[in-house]
Amino acid sequence: MTIKLTPELLEWAYELLNHTEPFDNWNLPDGHEIKFEVTKSAKDCGDYTGYTDGTHRIRISSRCIGTLQKLIEIMAHEMVHLHQATARMETKSQHNAAFYKLAAQVCRIHKFDPKAFA
């Protein structure tokens, strides 16, 4: 049985992670400040977009996510992108050296599969 993704569930997953290391030290926005959307993309399991007006959006695909574990891993991946954006660590390369360093820290703490961050 697969879980049914909703924007509310995405926000709850975000808030859960945001209260754990290392996210709780990253000064990320509260969940209510982020727009969460469920997509049906077969190509992208998730994506983060930061806008010039300071707003944020995280989208997660229901076609890629069937378990709570996978949802949490993909949300954590997008939260690394969010952290890079808010800390001004982004480059033209979506996954730069800083991303992989932060992702390794998240995977080590939460015992996530590093392939979810590739």
Q: What is each stretch, according to the model?
A:
Residues 1-73, 82-118:
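Active-site-proximal or metal-binding-adjacent scaffold patches in catalytic folds
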Residues 78:
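Walker B catalytic acidic pair
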